[in-house]
Amino acid sequence: MSEVLTVDAVLFGLLVFSGIIGNIMVIYVVFDCAKLCASRHLPPSDTILVHLCLANLLTSVFRTVPIFVSDLGLQVWLTAGWCRVFMLLWVWWRAVGCWVTLALSAFHCATLRRQHVSMGPLGHSRERRRVWVVLAVVWAANLLFSLPALVYTTQVRGNATVELMVISCTTRPLLGCVWEFPTFQQGYAFASSSLALNEVLPLVLMVGTNLATLQALGKHIRTVRAGGSTGAELDRHVSSERKAGHVIMALVALFVGCWVLQVAAVTYYNHNRGAHAEGLLTVAHFSASLFVGFSPLVVALGHGKLRRRISGILQSCMHRLKQTQDKPAEITEKDGRTTQSAMK
């Protein structure tokens, strides 16, 4: 393995495993915080966040980790049947991640623009039910769209030239799994529809939703300031709304930036395959994992409860590690005192 490849593999591995650890930590902390609440229910925004982290976690474990392993030189091949299953899962989880990110942004925008806030257990229950229905539709609709992977996926061994790339799965043959359509026209139609429905449309809607969120956030802050709230309560409420808006906008901006690079690379490959195709695919290779790796960090740093809870967990782990390191020193010191006493 060359030195450059080793550096690339190390950087890519850091992205992969930081994404896995980050998503697991966010999911754990969200459920842990829910257990401390009186209602013991996940808030709607945290429910969407858990689904986003779950989709990212599944994508990292079942797709990005095999990519990292293949970068290290270990080749693993699946049978044709398992290739169809894995291709279905890759397309499904990738598309779910796109649409759940949009759902998180849209939920915050709708919350800011809403005139009447649902109060009481019945109102909160109704809002949670609506969120679960939307998430169920997202998972089910994307599963239906991913079903062609069960038909048009095949298995190859050794070096293979990819004639067509479908952006929702991977930018290269992985585990020996590639797309195989009866004609190039059919494959191009599926790749184009996948690009339009699962990439371009969510990206455009995210940008529009972010702009609407900025407008609604400004209007909401002006409305709160015009009300009769006290100074401390007003500052706390405005600060909370701003932080929530900044977190979601940073998350969407990270998503848009990473996914635009991958969309551009795969589109260039399918249409041109010029001299820059290999370099662009390398950029796409990293950008696809950049969002998965850094999105938990963005969420953890911007979400007040998550930030405090994760900080407490990290401090507890550091304290336990320090105690573990201090114990051998204490034992050695006690043994030394015992030996000195015996000599006397």
Curated annotation (Swiss-Prot):
SUPFAM superfamilies linked to this entry: Family A G protein-coupled receptor-like (SSF81321)
Record topological domains on the Cytoplasmic side: 32-47, 106-130, 208-246, 301-344
Subcellular location: Cell membrane
Tissue expression profile of the protein: Highly expressed in the olfactory rosette. Specifically localizes to crypt neurons in the olfactory neuroepithelium. Colocalizes with the inhibitory G-protein gnaia in crypt neurons. Not detected in other tissues tested.
Keywords, sorted A to Z: Cell membrane, Disulfide bond, G-protein coupled receptor, Glycoprotein, Membrane, Olfaction, Receptor, Sensory transduction, Transducer, Transmembrane, Transmembrane helix
Gene3D superfamilies: Rhodopsin 7-helix transmembrane proteins (1.20.1070.10)
Transmembrane segments: 11-31, 48-68, 85-105, 131-151, 187-207, 247-267, 280-300
Disulfide bonds: 83-169
Membrane topology term: Multi-pass membrane protein
Major place of residence: membrane
Annotated GO CC locations: plasma membrane
Chain ranges on the Extracellular side, renumbered to this chain: 1-10, 69-84, 152-186, 268-279
CDD domains in UniProt: 7tm_classA_rhodopsin-like
Any one GO BP annotation for this protein: sensory perception of smell
Positions of glycan attachment: 159
Compositional bias of kind Basic and acidic residues: 324-337
Entries under InterPro entries matching the protein: GPCR_Rhodpsn, GPCR_Rhodpsn_7TM
MF terms in GO: G protein-coupled receptor activity
Segments for region (Disordered): 324-344
PANTHER family hit by this protein: OLFACTORY RECEPTOR CLASS A-LIKE PROTEIN 4, TASTE RECEPTOR TYPE 2
UniProt similarity note: Belongs to the G-protein coupled receptor 1 family.
Task of the protein: Probable olfactory receptor.
The protein, known as: Olfactory receptor class A-like protein 4
Organism: Danio rerio
Lineage: Eukaryota, Metazoa, Chordata, Craniata, Vertebrata
Gene: ora4
